[in-house]
């Protein structure tokens, strides 16, 4: 539980978390230098820590995971090249079309299954033949977790092997990869090992106020550093931000189990009201697909009781995080009973 704020019921996203007192102190005490010149010791330490944690050679600090993903895509693909991506993946649907707008990289979206996978035969069929009429397919990008669901390890292995057999690089949008690791019991490096690059967001479940990392080989990170400068992401005394990331990686990964447990309790509460159409909680998210329930009225009823939820792709999304405590979960239980008159 965040020790600087009162318990509240903001379930919109794990991005709403606020730094704890310990994290704020680490930020205030951070040793800083000019990160563009690689002279910020705290940022350098964070990058080394992230690379080691994910089993990669190098890492680069970014203002956001959106920019980290974009730099990763552009580091793998040149102008006019193509990357394969899920049709409902964040990197394609929710990041402003950056690869196309800023990188002149063409997306080839393919349908995601409900669990986030992309059919392997569809991937094979989407890879363009070596013909000058076609863009060159350079990259396969996957997302883990996907709507709160960890990708199956055997699928990751099969998809990345398929990509390599066709000469494609692989990138993982791992904004919540630590949630996937905690939920499956896998070491984060075992998940990252299948990919050429991985992005990691610090400002979601990890609880930092800002920041993300791109990890990969030294060569790829070197290209991404040049791209980061072009995108305006080269910042100076970033140690005050990196210190929050270090604090998060050291203290907030294992505690994600608490978020996952609370999400499971939410799912159990919602399951008592079948008309809410609650999905299962595999990590820190629960999705509702109400049947015969006015979603706006439902959300307004809860908001009037200081319980805020979000929506995503036609569903209500509930996300647990370090600012959600047991009392917040019980408030949801009481509000559900009141709403349905039970």
Language-model-detected regions and their locations in the chain:
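Conserved PLP-enzyme active-site core in the AAT-like
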Residues: 2-324, 332-342
């Amino acid at each position: 539980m965040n020790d600087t704020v009162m318990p509240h019921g903001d379930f919109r996203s794990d991005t709403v978390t606020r730094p704890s007192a310990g994290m704020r102190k680490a930020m205030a005490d951070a040793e800083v230098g000019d990160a563009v010149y690689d002279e910020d010791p705290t940022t350098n330490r964070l990058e080394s820590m992230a690379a080691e944690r994910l089993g990669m050679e190098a890492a680069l600090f970014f203002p956001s995971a959106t920019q980290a993903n974009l730099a990763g895509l552009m580091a793998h693909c040149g102008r006019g090249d193509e990357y394969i991506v899920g049709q409902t993946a964040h990197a394609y649907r929710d990041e402003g079309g950056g690869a196309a707008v800023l990188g002149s990289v063409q997306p080839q979206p393919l349908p995601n299954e409900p669990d986030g996978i992309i059919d392997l035969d569809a991937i094979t069929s989407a890879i363009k033949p070596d013909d000058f009429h076609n863009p060159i397919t350079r990259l396969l990008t996957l997302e883990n977790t996907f709507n709160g669901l960890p990708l199956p390890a055997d699928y990751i292995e099969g998809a990345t092997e398929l990509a390599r057999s066709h000469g494609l690089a692989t990138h993982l949008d791992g904004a919540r990869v630590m949630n996937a690791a905690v939920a499956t019991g896998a070491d984060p490096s075992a998940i990252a090992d299948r990919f050429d690059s991985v992005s990691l967001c610090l400002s979601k479940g990890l609880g930092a106020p800002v920041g993300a990392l791109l990890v990969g080989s030294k060569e790829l990170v070197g290209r991404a550093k040049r791209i980061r400068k072009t995108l305006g992401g080269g910042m100076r005394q970033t140690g005050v931000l990196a210190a929050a990331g270090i604090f998060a990686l050291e203290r907030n990964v294992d505690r994600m189990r608490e978020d996952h447990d609370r999400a499971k309790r939410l799912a159990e509460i919602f399951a008592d009201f079948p008309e809410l159409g609650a999905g299962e909680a595999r990590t820190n998210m629960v999705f509702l697909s109400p049947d015969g329930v006015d979603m706006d009225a439902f959300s307004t009823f809860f908001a009037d009781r200081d319980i805020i939820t979000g929506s995503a792709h036609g569903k209500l999304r509930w996300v647990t995080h370090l600012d959600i405590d047991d009392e917040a979960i019980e408030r949801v239980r009481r509000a559900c009973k009141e709403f349905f008159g039970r």
